[in-house]
A protein has these predicted regions:
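Carboxylate/His-rich catalytic cores and anion/metal-binding grooves
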Residues: 67-98, 187, 249-259, 521-563
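Well-ordered alpha-helical scaffold segments within catalytic/enzyme domains
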Residues: 56-60, 274, 305-311, 464-471, ...
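Accessory carbohydrate-binding/adhesion or oligomerization-edge regions at the termini
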Residues: 30-34, 44-57, 61-65, 96-151, ...
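Aromatic-lined ligand-binding clefts that engage carbohydrates, nucleic acids, or primary amines
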Residues: 135, 159, 167-197, 227
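Aromatic-rich carbohydrate-recognition surfaces in CAZymes
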Residues: 404-405, 437-454, 513-622, 638-652, ...
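Extended ligand-binding clefts on enzyme/binding-domain cores
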Residues: 342-385, 508-520, 526-533, 552, ...
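Extended, loop-rich substrate-binding clefts of extracytoplasmic carbohydrate-active enzymes
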Residues: 145, 149-157, 251-299, 377-393
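Acidic/polar, glycine-enriched structural segments that form the non-catalytic walls/loops
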Residues: 29-45, 96-126, 225, 250-256, ...
Length: 820
């Protein structure tokens, strides 16, 4: 389990070596002032983010409220301290538990327990329960093949697993500070001697630490105990594992807590200010993800800038410390690591990574990287290796300001994955490495020497994102976009293949881990269509090539290209024919409209024609197909899926017209109009349109219709969209518009698409404000969940997904209108 630092050992004699380097430009005071202050309480604050693996967040209001984490919720500890005249203040991270095993989990031992996959009667979790014939013995963990440490297979959809684990405890065990740690997928209930102690609802999480307070610990007794779990798998992966641990952490006595004065989140920068006695500390976390600079967009290096200011007019002796752990480079805390001091071209580094270095050996959803190396250079301070209370190494950065009234500097941290992705059985590094001709050390040197100019460009980019949101909506919309930019970009990997194609692959975070999923590429598209359509092409080219090459032969687009980071072909078990074909054609048409020509699609015209014909022939009244919105089950005769097909046929006609194929364009335009007329008649139910053609008293968001407005193609009568939008306003809940009439949950990416269908800004903002309220108030402290309950504000599932690039749909509409 997690082994965490005891600060007193780091700040005293635990250092085993140190090296330093100075000489970089001091940041200007302007860099510590955000372009705009923001009021939005982001559920999880981006700190150091680069790609799906190098991704560190603070899911707290205060940076000291807990341990910094990867989006998976795995701990990736960063601790920050400022010592002023001998008094140390903690400004980042929290004093953490160090868990030692009493009863192991599956990553330490193949523990054995009784289990059943038959629905059990009341009392099955009680110690006195006598398991019958449906019970058998199995080894942990239970779950889907391919998930970590699964030794007993269980993965059936809509199925149940019951586990009874007998645990023998000594009197001394009960005197400890106890934790139960569990991992699960999906709905999970945990019992101690028959009493329920955890009930998760539908979610999937690894390594949840449940502290046993006095009341919960009293459920245990000396001798034999039964810890029981019930897990229900709804869909996708399944998993169950749990264990019992004790906290052996040592209190960091004498360290005071800094007072957080402010927090502002903009597109590329997160700004904090802390009060540390007579000194204020400004800290800026910067991910220089400039969308028009591919080297910076793909760079695995982030800045942390810091400034100290005396508030009493006096000089103070000041030292800043930032401390990381080898967990930055681990998938499981039990993996052996190697942490060293090293030098390259006159600059010193502290580096950590696993001993085994299993490059690209793992693929999947809720996992962290365990190959490559995490680095902190001594660009403006000293780097050291320390040890924690469990004798684990620490990576320490120190800046000695000495006596000063005001001073500023910056540090960097980065991650070299060595090999980042496999595409069609060839391995590639990120774009920034230019095929291996640029090393991580050269990239650090560039980022160091160009710090001032890069930071200024980031400020200008922050301004553009905020101002575009303000112009299209209001301050709340601008703050939503500002808080979402790094979230979207960090779910991707940018690289170039051997043929020179620019490729930009998403990871389907927290919803199966697929790579380059087309029904993520579609909802996230507005961001990239606004600011860099070449990146949109970089998500689509590989899908077109997959069909063009003959590797994918079906008459519609593939769902995905594999499981991240292995992109060798579709792995998803079921197709989404209308969904993916419609997505690809619609986006292709929008790209052609932005380019003013069809050069991008000409190579793929035969493939595109095949897909268009599939939509034309099958999209009027869809059969029972999977689609992207089948959370409550997929229904035949889906009206929104039919709209997707109609707009896909329209998209083909628009591209044909641009190619000069007038007869083809007229034919498919006529077909789209005929489909739309029938759709309007068959879907109409008084003041709105149904969820499915044959389902009375239903409704759903018809977000796919927004393209008819953006393109001004008038495939549907104007009154159709107006009628739907007016109806939606009667269905909103506290935190937004449900996805459809079946459940209270929604998808905020689609809500923003739907909002863009509104005829005026005032109506648009009526949809935006509940989404803002959700982001601002949700108790689900994760990188913004796109799938959530509109009444409770709690996530239903999904986090850190790139689909919230869809928040930019209104900005896209504004930009397209300004072009016309």
């Amino acid at each position: 389990m997690k082994r965490l630092l005891t600060l007193s050992l780091v700040l005293s004699a635990a250092l085993v070596g140190s090296v330093s380097c100075t000489g970089s430009t001091e940041p200007s005071a302007e860099l510590f002032q955000p372009y705009k202050t923001t009021a939005l309480r982001t559920p999880s604050v981006p700190l150091v983010v680069s790609d799906p693996y190098f991704s560190i967040w603070s899911p707290y209001d205060q940076l000291i409220d807990g341990t910094t984490r990867h989006w998976t919720n795995d701990e990736k500890p960063l601790d920050g301290f400022l010592t002023v005249d001998g008094q140390t203040y903690r400004w980042m991270g929290a004093e953490r538990t160090i868990l030692a095993t009493i009863v192991p989990m599956a990553d330490e031992e193949a523990w054995t327990a009784q289990y059943s996959r038959t629905v059990q009667p009341e009392g099955w979790q009680q110690p006195a329960f006598a398991p019958g014939d449906s019970w058998q013995e199995g080894q942990a963990a239970w779950g889907s093949d391919g998930l970590s440490y699964v030794r007993t297979h269980w993965s059936d959809l809509n199925s149940d697993l019951y586990v009874r684990r007998t645990v023998n405890l000594k009197a001394d065990d009960l005197k400890e500070d106890l934790y139960i740690v569990y991992s699960h997928d999906d709905v999970f209930e945990l019992y101690i001697n028959g009493t329920k102690v955890a009930d998760t609802g539908e979610t999937w999480v690894e390594g949840v630490q449940l502290h046993l307070d006095a009341k919960l610990k009293a459920l245990l007794h000396e001798g034999e105990n039964v810890i029981a779990a019930h897990c229900h798998n709804t869909t996708g992966g399944a998993y169950t594992d749990f264990g019992l641990f004790k906290n052996i952490g040592i209190s960091n006595a004498g360290i005071e807590t800094a007072k957080q004065k402010s927090l502002d989140v903009l597109a590329t920068n997160t700004y904090y200010t802390f009060i540390c006695g007579p000194v204020e500390l400004d800290v800026v976390f910067t991910a220089p993800m400039l969308i028009d600079d591919y080297d910076l967009l793909s760079s695995p290096i982030n800045y942390i800038s810091y400034q100290v200011r005396s508030t009493d007019g006096k000089e103070h002796d000041i030292q800043l410390n930032v401390i990381a752990t080898p967990e930055m480079a681990l998938n499981k805390a039990s993996q052996p690591t190697n942490t060293i001091l090293m030098e390259n071209n006159g600059l010193q580094y502290v580096r950590t990574g696993t001993v085994d270095q299993p490059i690209l050996a793992k693929k999947g959803d809720g996992i962290c990287i365990d190959w490559g190396y995490f680095y902190i250079p001594a660009a403006n301070g000293t780097v050291t290796v320390g040890t924690d209370a469990a004798d684990k190494p620490l990576l320490c950065y120190t800046h000695e300001f000495g006596k000063t009234r005001q001073a500023a500097s910056f540090m960097m941290m980065g991650y070299d994955e060595i090999e980042d992705i496999e595409y069609m059985y060839k391995r590639y590094k990120g774009y920034w490495a230019h095929g291996g001709t640029v090393s991580i050390f050269q990239m650090f040197q560039r980022m160091r020497s160009q710090y001032q100019s890069i930071m200024q460009r980031c400020r200008e980019f922050d301004k553009m994102i905020y101002d575009d949101g303000l112009a299209a909506g209001n301050e709340h919309y601008a703050e939503i976009l500002s808080a979402s930019y790094r979230h979207v970009i960090a779910a991707h990997k940018l690289f170039q293949d051997d043929e020179g194609n620019l490729l930009f692959f998403s990871k389907e975070n927290n919803s199966n881990g697929c790579v380059n999923t087309v029904d993520l590429t579609y909802p996230e598209a507005p961001l990239f269509l606004c600011y860099n359509p070449e990146l949109q092409k970089a998500m689509m080219t590989s899908v077109f090539d997959y069909s063009l090459s003959g590797r994918w032969t079906k008459p519609f687009a593939a769902h995905d290209l594999g499981t991240y980071p292995i992109a060798n072909g579709q792995v998803y078990g079921a197709d989404m024919p209308l969904e993916e074909a419609g997505n690809m054609l619609t986006l292709a048409a929008q790209l052609c409209k932005l380019d003013g020509n069809t050069n991008y699609v000409d190579k793929y015209w035969n493939v595109i024609t095949t897909w268009a014909d599939y939509l034309s022939e099958n999209g009027q009244d869809p059969e029972n197909q999977l689609c992207t919105d089948d959370f409550a089950g997929h229904w035949a005769h889906n009206t929104n899926l039919s709209i997707k097909a109609i707009m896909g046929v329209t998209a083909y006609a628009e591209m044909a017209r641009m190619k000069g194929l007038r007869d083809v364009a007229d034919k498919y335009t006529a077909r789209a109009r005929a489909m739309a007329r029938k759709w309007e008649k068959d879907a109409r139910e008084g003041d709105h349109y149904r969820l499915a053609f044959d389902r009375n008293n239903t409704w759903s968001q018809k977000y796919n219709m927004v393209w008819d407005k953006l393109w001004q193609t008038s495939i549907f009568p104007a009154a159709t969209m107006e009628r739907e939008v007016k109806y939606y306003l009667t269905k909103q809940n506290k935190y937004g518009l449900p996805l459809d009439s079946r459940k209270d949950y929604s998808k905020n990416d689609w809500t923003m698409w739907t909002a863009a269908m509104a005829g005026d800004r005032e109506t648009f903002l009526k949809f935006v404000e509940p989404v803002y309220k959700y982001i601002n108030e949700t108790e689900s402290r994760v990188p913004t969940s796109d799938w959530y309950d509109t009444k409770t504000g709690l996530m239903a599932g999904f986090k850190a997904r790139s689909v919230i690039g869809g928040f930019w749909m209104r900005v896209l509409e504004e930009k397209l209108n300004n072009r016309n």
